[in-house]
Amino acid sequence: MKHHAGLIGLLGLALTIFAYAMFQGGFVSWFLLYATLPFLMFAFIIYFYPVRKMTATRTFTEGELTRGQKLDVEIHIKRSDWWPLYYMKVTDQPPFPEETPKSRVVFIGFRREVVLNYSIDKLPRGAYEFNALELELVDLLGWLRKRWTISTPQQVVVYPRITELSYTPIASNYDQGAARARYQMHKENAVATGVREYQPGDRVSWIHWKSFAKSQTLRTKDFEDRQAQDTLVYLDLTESHSFDDAVDFTISVVQAMASSDTTGAFILPGTRGIYLPAITHQGHVERVKRELATVEPLEEKWMKRLVAEDKRLGTFKGIICITAELDKDRVEAMTHMTPQLREGLYFVVKTEASPKLTTAELAVVDYAQARGWSVVVLPPSQFTEAFLEVLKR
């Protein structure tokens, strides 16, 4: 409708100037008519210009995106003709929270391809969908504006940030002295629970020959690791300002566990959660990372209910619970569900802006310690020293 209004305005202007020249006569009136004709013709051409033939694509920063990283976006706009155009306004709406539309104005002239760039600092974790680009052509004097959109749906996934740290099993004082060696021996007699991609170092006896016969691709049997029942990494999903930092620390611990000489289990609670009885290779880490990229925090009451109903917790002797907020009810529920617990550790992750426990949380520390839980408070700057703090206790 706006396009039609612009066309009607142009026709009205052209008729007015022509009528003025016809009835007024003289050099001035006819000069005015001929002087405005090129601009009017250019505006009419803009109106009828086949904008649908233009194509647009986005390209993003290469490689895996992590929280806090900078994203560079490059927009390529192409057309098939050489018709001269004045300038075009390109608007893109990034899907990230609190991001305003990114607009650029570019002079086109005879160019058939235009490249525009913009950047987004400090990406938030999650999966996001870029939608349509909005383009706007304008004539020389701004009499006519032609807007349209080009559908360019693209998804980007921002993963949690991994910090390298040295993992120390909290259950090293019971049955973990030669965990890796016994894990290898256990595999020889354990029952396979699935198959995975072949990893360097896998034994010939672990190869899944039936799968190899069908696909001609080496795959390895995935075994249930009963030794891993000793230690569990559990992420508390209670909503908090430092929830994303807690997610970052969780994937860092899982990565360190997979790279160490010990094994452990992982539970991400909730209806869309996952349970890994053993974290033994990078494939497990990648699966956890994909899930943590899109995990959302829960209200406190729902998180308490998940803990109180999770019977899997009762099979573990050592538990590393990572939370962004220490709460008495959840500590009580966790204690009740872990009758075999010998070593319990709460990592309470805080932001750099507020690195200390609140008054309410300080009161819970004594309650947790009385029930066998150690409590370590961590801002992101101390992630690398997390398990050093555990050894000091």
Predicted regions and their residues:
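An amphipathic, basic-hydrophobic helix/alpha-beta surface used to engage anionic
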Residues: 38-282, 318-322, 335-336
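Acidic, glycine-rich A-domain
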Residues: 255-393
